[in-house]
UniProtKB/Swiss-Prot annotation:
SUPFAM superfamilies: LDH C-terminal domain-like, NAD(P)-binding Rossmann-fold domains. GO terms for biological process: glycolytic process; lactate metabolic process. The modification Phosphotyrosine is found at residue 223. This is L-lactate dehydrogenase 1. Beta-D-fructose 1,6-bisphosphate binds at residues 156, 171. Pathway: Fermentation; pyruvate fermentation to lactate; (S)-lactate from pyruvate: step 1/1. The lineage of its organism: Bacteria, Bacillati, Bacillota, Bacilli, Lactobacillales. InterPro entries: L-lactate/malate_DH (IPR001557), L-lactate_DH (IPR011304), L-lactate_DH_AS (IPR018177), Lactate/malate_DH_C (IPR022383), Lactate/malate_DH_N (IPR001236), Lactate_DH/Glyco_Ohase_4_C (IPR015955), NAD(P)-bd_dom_sf (IPR036291). The gene is ldh1. The keyword Transferase does not apply. GO terms for cellular component: cytoplasm. Its EC number is 1.1.1.27. It comes from the Bacteria. CDD domains: HicDH_like.
């Protein structure tokens, strides 16, 4: 696999996130082949036809309504399939129904002979990334979740608006669960090497209460958007496109994705969001940022919360019987 061109993507799930992701791939000229799988075959046929009409403005690409068997020679399978988060519902409320969907999808993808990389975006993403690893039997590095990539983008954008700097020049991360127990790594947030906490103090941008409020607006952004329009999909779609490009082009880009935890942060046997080098083999190398004591406690708490849910779910025979890892 290391020597072949990584240009074929199979998307499973043609809902709001999936179709937005497909549109992002077309707009950005990412991948040479895109197959779309969904229970609603006509929807995938319609989207494939509609998307193909944009190719004359972007770059050549084969786009089609696919079946699970088409994943056999794919380089990347992207999972957006799952029940959507409803108003007032947390990502963790989705666990069991989306575990069932994930088990079914992953089993069918693996049965096709697929040997590439799994990229998981369905929620709760850290738990479903773990489940994809368990159900697939794949090496840990070849199962990647979108993790805190969207949260980090939201964080950088919120900071950029406050300090009047291009968001791409803000170096800051959200880590932990993609959800309510996530946290901001303020100890390493900086612009051009200047810590943002110091910048705030010197330039009178934000006081302590405003800093807390800014983070909370980032953490709770999905709830706000869901209450207004029913779902979030544009931001995560572009985040997935960015991760896709890093994998297909073997970029070795540092991105905040959902990574298997081996005890580096006092957390084991689960996936959590942290920066990692991402390339053709998936997670090439996790980057373990040295956290301060408060941040370490938050990472441990986030992991403990997810691990408890994982253990409870996988104690059930319907999931335990499908485990390959």
């Amino acid at each position: 696999m290391a020597d072949k061109q990584r240009k074929k993507v199979i998307l499973v799930g043609d809902g709001a996130v999936g179709s937005s992701y497909a549109f992002a791939l077309v707009n950005q000229g990412i991948a040479q082949e895109l197959g779309i799988v969904d229970l609603f075959k006509e929807k995938t046929q319609g989207d494939a036809e509609d998307l193909s009409h944009a190719l004359a403005f972007t770059s050549p690409k084969k786009i089609y309504s696919a079946d699970y068997s088409d994943a056999s020679d794919a380089d990347l399978v992207v999972l957006t399939s799952g029940a959507p988060q409803k108003p007032g519902e947390t990502r963790l409320d989705l666990v069991e129904k989306n575990l069932r969907i994930t088990k079914d999808v992953v089993t069918k993808i693996v049965a096709s002979g697929f040997k590439g990389i799994f990229l998981v975006a369905a929620n709760p993403v850290d738990i479903l990334t773990y489940a994809t690893w368990k159900f697939s039997g794949f090496p840990k590095n070849r199962v990647v979740g979108s993790g805190t990539s969207l949260d980090t983008a939201r964080f950088r954008q919120a900071l950029a608006e406050k300090v009047d700097v291009d968001a791409r020049s803000i170096h800051a991360y959200i880590m932990g669960e993609h959800g309510d127990s996530e946290f901001a790594v303020w100890s390493h947030a900086n612009v051009a090497g200047v810590k943002l906490e110091q910048w705030f103090q010197e330039n009178d941008y934000l006081n302590e209460a405003e800093i807390v409020k800014l983070f909370e607006s980032v953490r709770d952004a999905a709830y706000s958007i869901i209450a207004k329009k029913g779902a979030t999909f544009y931001g995560v779609a572009v985040a997935l496109a960015r991760i896709t490009k890093a994998i297909l082009d073997d970029e070795h880009a540092v991105l905040p994705v959902s990574v298997f935890q081996d005890g580096q942060y006092g957390v084991s046997d689960c996936y959590l969001g942290q920066p990692a080098v991402v390339g053709a083999e998936g997670v090439v190398n996790p980057i373990h940022i040295p956290l301060n004591d408060a941040e370490m406690q938050k990472m441990e708490a986030s992991g403990a919360q997810l691990k408890a849910i994982i253990d409870e779910a996988f104690a059930k025979e319907e999931f335990a019987s499908a485990v390959k890892n």
